[in-house]
Amino acid sequence: MSSARPVRAARGTTLTARSWSTEAPLRMLQNNLDPEVAERPDDLVVYGGTGKAARNWASFDAIVRELTTLSDDETLLVQSGKPVGVLRTHEWAPRVLLANSNLVGDWANWPEFRRLDALGLMMYGQMTAGSWIYIGTQGILQGTYETFAAVAERRFGGTLAGTLTITAGLGGMGGAQPLAVTMNEGVALVVECDPERAHRRVKHGYLDEVADGLDQAIEKAEAAKAQRRAYSVAVIGNAAEVLPELLRRGVRADIVTDQTSAHDPLSYLPLGVELEDWEDYASKKPEEFTDRARDSMAKHVEAMVGFMDAGAEVFDYGNSLRGEAQLAGYGRAFDYPGFVPAYIRPLFCEGKGPFRWAALSGDPADIAATDRAILDLFGDDDHLARWIRLAGEKVSFQGLPARICWLGYGERHLAGLRFNEMVASGELKAPLVLGRDHLDCGSVASPYRETEGMADGSDAIADWPLLNALVNTASGATWVSLHHGGGVGMGRSLHAGQVTVADGTALAAQKLERVLTNDPGMGVIRHVDAGYDRAREVATERGVRVPGLA
């Protein structure tokens, strides 16, 4: 029986596999489980409560064995974290195809998933955990930064200086919140139930400090707000208790949101349950635990609505908190909007989304070189240039050095081609992988998040992520994934991802141009079809072929 052990991706140019097309997924799988990156690496959990990179350690070892011997005309099939076959394909085909957590409609729920998981037949892949392109908290940082920047522009004159944001959750995703707020010059007070998570965010530079208690947290946050000084502080506690208390005390919040792991009730700590009892209670009495968690979420959301009634800008960050509170009987759960329809959809209409790349060399200098290349290509975009400079100054790498940068249709392929040239010339010490979050413009169906409130009512249509996976497979991506339930939980989302290697070859250049054109192109097409004028303009201006578009 294979057992847990520390995992770390190789660095440098010495290959373990037969080519960079197979070395790349091998290193990124291992990187997902690097102790600097993963939330619970011994359990193969990368982020998001239970999002895993492989089904079990035996499956992990089998995947590694197959990747080290895979040829460039073969494709490895991975079913919910377990390798199930190797097929002869061709050099343009993906080297790996992954399907994670997918269940047929009537069976797409947590109890059925947990039954199958207990039998060893499935795993929960989240979005980038099971697709091997998680880069640590930076992976969600720019999306969170862009959201707060949009709030600042719409409500606070373009800056969060002099504002207080109250939120909760400092896990792999939520940990980006305090830095995203301070990058926008604001103050963040974050509630987190697990002290280890909070101190980890301090260690990685995403959080300024952890307060000794609620009184100190309020005092320091309000002082920084009065001084218009960027600052972030965490308080250890349960959000369902702390947010109502902050409201009761009359703390004036300007913005309120949340990134606890509410997508799975077993990943949300109920009121009255001690941290050390959490895992045992959830595993032994999941139904009772779920009911208590939902009751706590209802109190949490009720407090958020209370802040909204008091004048705060309140939005959901796509973790199903509202839906779970509604299931508990709270009638005003959907009184505040999700972040995508409120702030992000205009970017999706331009094919923009969380494009990212990682340096297989392991050398931070390679990412610094790509930052300079991005500024050279897109330096006229002041907003993007500011992000790249801030990221270079403030973001600590976890595992292999990486960068996230929201680029749109007509931009991603230019970056990919430039990076490939830099590998070929030796300016970069080793190849890069170029991928993205599944939370993208044309790769997800998620009525509680990315596709909430679509103009034509098409929120739940799931053809789009399927088409996206097929398009990327046909375009030359190195590995392609199709998942269910990421971000918002079982029965609530379908989503696809791609990763493509830039190894400096002419073949890689051809693949990169196609994938990094067609992938964001799906976002433009999706939003044209839904009736968005901005998407129609982008399609017309940039030559995206949409039948019937004048």
Curated annotation (Swiss-Prot):
Pathway: Amino-acid degradation; L-histidine degradation into L-glutamate; N-formimidoyl-L-glutamate from L-histidine: step 2/3
Name of the featured protein: Urocanate hydratase
Function: Catalyzes the conversion of urocanate to 4-imidazolone-5-propionate.
Coiled coil: none
Organism, scientific name: Saccharopolyspora erythraea (strain ATCC 11635 / DSM 40517 / JCM 4748 / NBRC 13426 / NCIMB 8594 / NRRL 2338)
UniProt entry keywords in alphabetical sequence: Cytoplasm, Histidine metabolism, Lyase, NAD
Subcellular localization: Cytoplasm
Source species taxonomy: Bacteria, Bacillati, Actinomycetota, Actinomycetes, Pseudonocardiales
Entry GO terms, CC: cytoplasm
Gene of this entry: hutU
SUPFAM superfamilies per record: Urocanase
EC top class, as a word: lyase
